[in-house]
Amino acid sequence: MGAAFNDVGAVILFVADLHRSRAFYHGVLGPDVQFEDADSVGFKIEGMAFIVLQVDRARVQLQGEPTATPRAGATAFLTTFTEDADALHADLVRRGVTFFQEPAEQPWGMRTAYFKDPDGHVWEIAQPVKQSA
């Protein structure tokens, strides 16, 4: 069998305003900045690179492919897993995050809550729910 495709080493989100996104991700959510240049800011989240990239400066990465035009609605959906969705939700609310869905148990066995970053990317916090035997 050939090389395996079974790991994601980085997530890169295109953003409209790099400074606004840096303030949200570092200042509100809290991960440390690992690198920063005129086009992007990189954070380390549990061993994975998480990068916000100014969309109008993504020429090298897109190699001539057009970038999306501004539109309404979510463009990405990301999940962070936690052992206590209610505690993480309360902590993020204290830091100024506005949730559009409060923590609730879902039929797929998770307790989830949802918020958006400044560019409308949807984040889910998810906690596995212990099933009764």
PLM feature segments, named:
Residues 122-125:
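Short glycine-/small-residue motifs
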Residues 21-26, 92, 120:
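Conserved active-site tyrosine of GNAT-family acetyltransferases
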